[in-house]
């Protein structure tokens, strides 16, 4: 029997569960259990029932769903921010991109899918346990070999000059990586930083003035979900609030 990658199960209340099917495995729900073999037989789009009769729908997780339910060793980059970073970086298939602050690998997956199988993501993480978890998360979801993981800091890496089409930073002190990022980034391409608080933004913008970068924009990404149950519609009571500021810098040719 061929075992697929991760599957997502949803119960009648919309609660989601990420499952990695394996031979002899069993998924346990508070309303019963179901063998992993049954999940494979149902397949994505199918339905299974636990031994107590609870109905579960079977899905192949989207990238957003996988990021929200995968194991984490660090606070994740939310999907709304990760997709916005890909847009701000203006990534396309075949490009090469640098990432610093791999964390749990969520943003890494968005970058890897954006550059495609002919592109490359070089991801740097200073903490070994974060890097190990990120590698497991990425390999489990993404079978394309277009990500290289590096243990260490970007500012200490040996990088080829003007060889990368984008730089994505998720660091507490991203200004320390600006010099190396400026060296590696192609002219007229972008560096995008993910920063939780505005004091970090001010520090980064101030530091960028000493390097060949120009500030393009600083933004927050809103995300407002609605509850629609005909004939009633209203915003959901629980909303995702502030997650981070995104800072986009453009590399220019130094005179």
From Swiss-Prot:
Q: Give residues annotated as binding S-adenosyl-L-methionine.
A: 104-107, 125, 130, 155, 170
This enzyme catalyses:
adenosine(58) in tRNA + S-adenosyl-L-methionine = N(1)-methyladenosine(58) in tRNA + S-adenosyl-L-homocysteine + H(+)
InterPro entries hit by this protein: SAM-dependent_MTases_sf (IPR029063), TRM61_C (IPR049470), tRNA_MeTrfase_Gcd14 (IPR014816)
Give EC number(s), comma-separated.
2.1.1.220
Q: Which GO terms describe its molecular function?
A: tRNA (adenine(58)-N1)-methyltransferase activity
Q: Does the keyword Ribosomal protein apply?
A: no
Recorded GO cellular component terms are: tRNA (m1A) methyltransferase complex
Per UniProt, the keywords (alphabetical) are: Methyltransferase, S-adenosyl-L-methionine, Transferase, tRNA processing
Name the PROSITE patterns for this protein. Answer: SAM_TRM61 (PS51620)
Query: Which CDD domains has this protein been placed in?
Result: AdoMet_MTases (cd02440)
Q: Summarize the subunit comment.
A: Homotetramer composed of a dimer of dimers.
Function per UniProt: Catalyzes the S-adenosyl-L-methionine-dependent formation of N(1)-methyladenine at position 58 (m1A58) in tRNA.
Stated name of the protein: tRNA (adenine(58)-N(1))-methyltransferase TrmI
From the broadest rank down, the organism's phylogenetic lineage runs:
Bacteria, Thermotogati, Deinococcota, Deinococci, Thermales
């Amino acid at each position: 029997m061929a075992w697929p990658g991760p599957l997502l199960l949803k119960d009648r209340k919309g609660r989601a569960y990420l499952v990695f099917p394996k031979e002899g495995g069993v998924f346990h729900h508070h309303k019963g259990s179901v063998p992993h073999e049954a999940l494979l037989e149902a397949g994505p789009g199918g339905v299974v029932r636990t031994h107590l009769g609870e109905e579960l729908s079977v899905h192949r997780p989207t990238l957003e769903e996988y990021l929200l339910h995968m194991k984490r060793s660090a606070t994740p980059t939310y999907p709304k921010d990760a997709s916005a970073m890909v847009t701000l970086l203006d990534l396309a298939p075949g490009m090469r991109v640098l990432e610093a602050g791999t964390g749990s690998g969520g943003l890494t997956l968005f970058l890897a899918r954006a550059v495609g199988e002919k592109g490359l993501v070089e991801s740097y993480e200073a903490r070994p346990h974060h890097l190990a978890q990120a590698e497991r998360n990425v390999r489990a979801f993404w079978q394309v070999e277009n990500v290289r993981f590096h243990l260490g800091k970007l500012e200490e890496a040996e990088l080829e000059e003007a060889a990368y089409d984008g730089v994505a930073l998720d660091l507490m002190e991203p200004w320390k990586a600006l010099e190396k990022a400026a060296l590696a980034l192609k002219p007229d391409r972008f560096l995008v930083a993910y920063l939780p608080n505005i004091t970090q933004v001010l520090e980064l913008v101030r530091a960028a003035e000493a390097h060949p970068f120009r500030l393009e924009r600083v933004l927050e990404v809103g995300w407002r979900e609605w509850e629609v149950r005909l004939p009633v519609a209203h915003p959901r009571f629980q909303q995702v609030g502030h997650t981070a500021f995104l800072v986009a810098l453009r590399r220019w040719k130094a005179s």
